[in-house]
């Protein structure tokens, strides 16, 4: 392909973001302020520019470029907008916390932007190696972010665990991709699907590769039994970093799974559906039962994340447009819930004190009714209690499962959701009905921008619960326009 034939428009958001983050990295060398105001402002402007570029490049149909290795389609565009918003919110939430603990450096913002760049590459990849490159860029940025607080032993330990296990998962994924290549003679997603559908693929090699690919994907999602890193990383990393690790990458991982399973390996759905059923059930059971035993909120939310990934897998394994769109709706709403949940913990923390345990939250309503209400909104939404958006997200994926004859799996999901409600309501009980023994809510140092965004974040959970159709329709149309009628 010559430069004259190259269409750069589909990759405009990534090009804008790469130029911006490279410039910010250089400019930050000359920034002396402790609060990194210039770097922070430039990073937010970079996100605005990336969001504008995403809207400018938005098309209602897939467009391939770079010799078919890159695609701009509605799924990618919706995901990129969500990722840009999540990254901006994470930066706003993290700034004061990082300043209080001495790791507010330019690297905090530039690493988040590089992670965003990796996620954008992931969601627009139409070639398995492009997917892998985006994944590794994201992973390397996250490793560095987790270890950014160098004086923190738990953070360093968490980064090392994530790095070692992440390398293992990447190896499994690459091994599976190599087998798929051996069986189909291509790494292009469309070509792989066509080879399998036409019967020209080596079924044995593709099936073996599928096992390794699903294992690698399960690690990135944090699904059981590849979930070992999730609780340790969530608890060990600084809360400002946990906030980012536990939100935006989940949406990117969803699109990552869609590219592999719903596009490249869609003709082999009968082979990967049973594996996803096992992963979904195991994630629901282990995630909810383990969360009941936790008193550390970050660790509880880690196991909660595992159970949420189980629900998202139910939507994916339905292998229908309704199932994929329900899973996408779930991924976006989970991202919003995670941002709000960890955001409240950050707001209630201050220099010398981290709000991390149930005891810290006891009696919060008597000290700060607004933050207590935000905790209630987040916990009710995660538990799936109407009219919060979490209820409609769970309802959508369970309905998709019922519509393809997996009623028994939907019943398992409902039972696990009822069990999971216990530990969410336990947090609400501590906030509203227990005596104030913790120091959360005392001498808060929250900035006005964080107060505003956190309030909007909480109200969005309620607003999307009352009016969920707009976002769900957007997800459904994106899936239909990107994947066809399937």
From Swiss-Prot:
InterPro entries for the chain: NADH-Q_OxRdtase_suN/2 (IPR010096), ND/Mrp_TM (IPR001750)
Residues spanning the membrane: 11-31, 44-64, 74-94, 103-123, 128-148, 163-183, 206-226, 238-258, 267-287, 300-320, 328-348, 371-391, 404-424, 452-472
GO terms under cellular component: plasma membrane
Membrane topology: Multi-pass membrane protein
Primary location group: membrane
Intracellular or extracellular location(s): Cell inner membrane
GO biological process: ATP synthesis coupled electron transport
Keywords of the record: Cell inner membrane, Cell membrane, Membrane, NAD, Quinone, Translocase, Transmembrane, Transmembrane helix, Transport, Ubiquinone
Recorded catalytic activity of this chain's protein: a quinone + NADH + 5 H(+)(in) = a quinol + NAD(+) + 4 H(+)(out)
GO molecular function, one term: NADH dehydrogenase (ubiquinone) activity
Assembly information from the UniProt record: NDH-1 is composed of 14 different subunits. Subunits NuoA, H, J, K, L, M, N constitute the membrane sector of the complex.
NCBIfam families xrefs: NDH_I_N, PRK05777.1-5
HAMAP family xref list: NDH1_NuoN_1
Protein name: NADH-quinone oxidoreductase subunit N
Organism: Laribacter hongkongensis (strain HLHK9)
UniProt lineage: Bacteria, Pseudomonadati, Pseudomonadota, Betaproteobacteria, Neisseriales
């Amino acid at each position: 392909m010559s430069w004259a034939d190259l269409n750069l428009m589909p990759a405009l958001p990534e090009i804008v973001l790469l130029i911006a983050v490279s410039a910010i990295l250089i400019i930050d060398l000359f920034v002396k302020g402790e609060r990194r105001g210039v770097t922070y402002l430039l990073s937010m402007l970079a996100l605005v520019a990336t969001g504008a570029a995403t809207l400018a490049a938005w098309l209602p149909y897939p467009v391939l470029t770079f010799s078919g290795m890159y695609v701009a389609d509605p799924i990618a565009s919706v995901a990129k907008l969500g990722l840009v918003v999540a990254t901006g919110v994470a930066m706003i939430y993290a700034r004061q916390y990082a300043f209080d603990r001495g790791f507010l450096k330019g690297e905090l913002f530039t690493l988040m932007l590089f992670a965003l760049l990796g996620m954008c590459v992931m969601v627009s990849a139409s070639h398995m190696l492009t997917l892998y490159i985006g994944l590794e860029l994201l992973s390397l940025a996250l490793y560095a972010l987790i270890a950014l607080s160098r004086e923190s032993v738990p953070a360093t330990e968490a980064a090392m665990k994530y790095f070692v296990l992440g390398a293992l998962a990447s190896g499994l994924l690459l091994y599976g991709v190599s087998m798929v290549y051996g069986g189909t003679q291509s790494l292009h997603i469309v070509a792989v699907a066509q080879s399998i559908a036409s019967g020209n693929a080596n079924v044995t090699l593709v099936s073996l590769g599928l096992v390794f690919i699903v294992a690698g994907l399960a690690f990135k999602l944090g699904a059981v039994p590849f979930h070992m890193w999730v609780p340790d990383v969530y608890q060990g990393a600084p809360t400002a970093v946990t906030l980012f690790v536990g939100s935006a990458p989940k949406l990117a991982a969803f699109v990552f799974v869609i590219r592999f399973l719903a596009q490249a390996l869609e003709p082999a759905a009968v082979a990967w559906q049973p594996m996803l059923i096992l992963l979904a059930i195991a994630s629901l059971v282990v995630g909810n039962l383990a969360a009941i035993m936790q008193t550390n909120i970050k660790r509880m939310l880690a196991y909660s994340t595992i159970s949420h990934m189980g629900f998202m897998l139910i939507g994916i394994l339905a292998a229908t447009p309704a199932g994929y769109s329900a899973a996408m709706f779930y991924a976006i709403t989970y991202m919003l819930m995670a941002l709000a949940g960890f955001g409240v913990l950050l707001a209630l923390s201050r220099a010398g004190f981290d709000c991390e345990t149930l005891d810290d939250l006891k009696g919060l309503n008597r000290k700060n009714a607004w933050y207590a209400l935000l905790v209630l909104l987040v916990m009710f939404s995660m538990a799936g209690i109407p009219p919060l958006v979490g209820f409609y997200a769970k309802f959508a994926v369970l309905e998709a499962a019922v519509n393809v004859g997996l009623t028994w799996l939907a019943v398992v999901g409902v039972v696990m959701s009822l069990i999971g409600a216990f530990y969410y309501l336990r947090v609400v009980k501590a906030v509203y009905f227990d005596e104030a023994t913790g120091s959360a809510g005392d001498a808060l140092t929250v900035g006005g921008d964080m107060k505003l965004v956190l309030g909007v974040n909480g109200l969005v959970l309620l607003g999307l619960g009352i009016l969920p159709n707009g976002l769900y329709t957007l997800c459904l149309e994106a899936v239909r326009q990107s994947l066809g009628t399937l």
